[in-house]
Amino acid sequence: MILGIDISTSITGFAVVAEGQLVYYDSIDLRKYKNIFDKTIAMKEKLLDIYEMYQCNNDGAAAGFGSSEYPIQHIYIEQSLHMFMGGKSSAKTLSTLTRFNGIVSWLGFELVEIRPEFVGATSARKQAGIKVPRGQKAKQVVLEHLLKTEPAFKIEYTKHGNPKPESFDRADAIVIAKAGWQLEQNNQEKA
């Protein structure tokens, strides 16, 4: 199984894909935590929950690491931004995001002893078969694509009829996980 993570200091999305099929997705809202340390503690708790769901034997026996019938074998994380994007990101924002990306990457490695792989958002969308037409917002295109093609993917709307913010992060995590699955398939074919 593949765990895909779309890391952000506001809302982080998670998705698990098995054999190319979405089996789990969720997010954690970190906006209520005011510093990177509190955000890290919340992330660790969320990753532990996922670890317990997919790495442990949940039949009540006190089995150890990796005893799940279908454990997570690979972790894919969206690569953090490395450049300014036309007034969208300040140096401070990029620095904080990169730092948090590194912390969460380490937490994932520490908890499940799997070295995360990093994939850029554009590359992930390409691997997942999503094309973003020029001039359109990638997050909106991804959301619409998944709503059309992924029966397990459901979103909630605000009272104004807009997708709730976590919908976009969950969708991005699904794309990262599906891209990770496709990349692993490509690696197996080459071997």
Where are these regions (language model features)?
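Phosphate- and other anionic-substrate recognition elements at nucleic-acid/protein interfaces
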Residues: M1-A191
